UniProtKB/Swiss-Prot annotation:
It comes from Debaryomyces hansenii (strain ATCC 36239 / CBS 767 / BCRC 21394 / JCM 1990 / NBRC 0083 / IGC 2968) (Yeast). Signal peptide: none annotated. Residues 143-168 are annotated as: Disordered. This is Ubiquitin-conjugating enzyme E2 2. PANTHER family: UBIQUITIN-CONJUGATING ENZYME E2 (PTHR24067). Residues 4-150 form the UBC core domain. Catalyzes the covalent attachment of ubiquitin to other proteins. Plays a role in transcription regulation by catalyzing the monoubiquitination of histone H2B to form H2BK123ub1. H2BK123ub1 gives a specific tag for epigenetic transcriptional activation and is also a prerequisite for H3K4me and H3K79me formation. Also involved in postreplication repair of UV-damaged DNA, in N-end rule-dependent protein degradation and in sporulation. GO terms for cellular component: chromosome, telomeric region; cytoplasm; HULC complex; MUB1-RAD6-UBR2 ubiquitin ligase complex; nucleus; Rad6-Rad18 complex; RAD6-UBR2 ubiquitin ligase complex; UBR1-RAD6 ubiquitin ligase complex. It comes from the Eukaryota.
Length: 168
């Protein structure tokens, strides 16, 4: 049965397919339009450049009146990302508006990468390094960028293992 939330998510998906912003992609799981996989590519000329950061977006039937829960599944060292991968982003909490769609959520997260809000950090260590020891912060971020590449390799290895199992 189609609900208002599911219809809206399908519109969001069509919009992402037709006019995805640079450096972001997202799609619903094949069997559940309420759960999406997303990827944000680290913006150029930032410490996150060339990183491939994966996220999960979980919507409920109150979308778009209620924001989704968004969580990085890639390792992320950032002042506004908790160790669990959950984000501290105003548009996903007190500044949410039903006018936001999947595309605008992801572009907001992408811009947050290089412009953290250090006044209310989710990761105090990252915020302190960002404020007081920028070169150490950049080094830690670059490590997460390199780790994001390894995650891609692990996925390919898993796919190859499945192909081998299928062939046997």
């Amino acid at each position: 049965m189609s609900t208002p939330a599911k219809r809206r998510l399908m519109r969001d998906f069509k919009r992402m397919q037709q006019d995805a912003p640079s450096g972001v992609s997202a799609s619903p799981l094949p069997d559940n339009v309420m759960s999406w996989n997303a990827v944000i590519i680290g913006p150029a000329d930032t410490p996150f450049e060339d990183g491939t950061f994966r996220l999960i977006l979980q919507f409920d039937e109150q979308y778009p009146n209620k924001p989704p829960s968004v969580k990085f599944i890639s390792e992320m060292f950032h002042p506004n990302v908790y160790a669990s991968g959950e984000l501290c982003l105003d548009i996903l909490q007190n500044r949410w508006s039903p006018t936001y769609d999947v595309s605008s959520i992801l572009t907001s997260i992408q811009s947050l990468l290089n412009d953290p809000n250090i006044s209310s950090p989710a990761n105090v260590e990252a915020a302190n390094l960002y404020k007081d020891h920028r070169s150490q912060y950049i080094k830690r971020v670059r490590e997460t960028v390199e780790n994001s590449w390894n995650e891609d390799d692990e996925d390919e290895d898993e796919d190859e293992d499945e192909d081998i199992d299928d062939a046997e």
